[in-house]
Amino acid sequence: MKRIFSIVFLLVALLATVSAQYFPVDTARLNSAYKVLVSGNRTLETETEFLAAYPTTWLEFYMTYSFVDDENYDYSMCEMCCEHISTLFSLTKVSDTILCKKIVDLTVGMKETGECTSFFQDYLIGYILSEDKLVLDYLSKLKKGYQMEFWQFCWSTVTECGRAENFKKLYARNKRKYPEQMKMSRIAFQYFYDGINYPELFPYKDEEYNRKFENKDYKYNFDDYIDYGGD
């Protein structure tokens, strides 16, 4: 009897561990903090609580909001992803430097996986353009690999789009004051703008990409495509 009880206990503990892996943050705390903010109660304390509850790393973000094709999977957090993102970028009471650190740290290593990350990317680009000094000052303190991972996500797109204009604006404005950052940003843009597919399409399931890939005469001339506004 004791042996059976021990086996059952171990199975329950294992299932609890596996389940917890999907939600590495306290989702009850996060949702509660979100509801307080959307109710109109915006103070330093309520915004700090939301920021503290929100994922801090890309892995936490992915495990909290990712879509898993399983009928038994709880999609409640996946469905709240965009609302939580817009709330994160709307915080005004917390310290600018604290919010900046949270956003940059979260972005490092992030991958374009679909609607949720695309939504985050839209807000991120707007944030960088409005708070470029703050972002670049903090980013410059990180290891170069982390800096490149940050820029990689910023400019990752599956097609050509308005991101090119965002890049040109940021580059022209900061190329002299932050030359190293803009060098990395330029390299990341060169390789990741219109340079990826969503994970489910990787590596060569996109027909248009296949045609380009199979065409030996096709060459993407990056320097002709983008105008940096001078060196």
Question: Each predicted region: which residue ranges?
Answer:
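Sec/Tat signal peptide C-region and signal peptidase I cleavage site
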Residues: 16-20
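Non-catalytic all-alpha helical scaffold/repeat segments
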Residues: 21-231
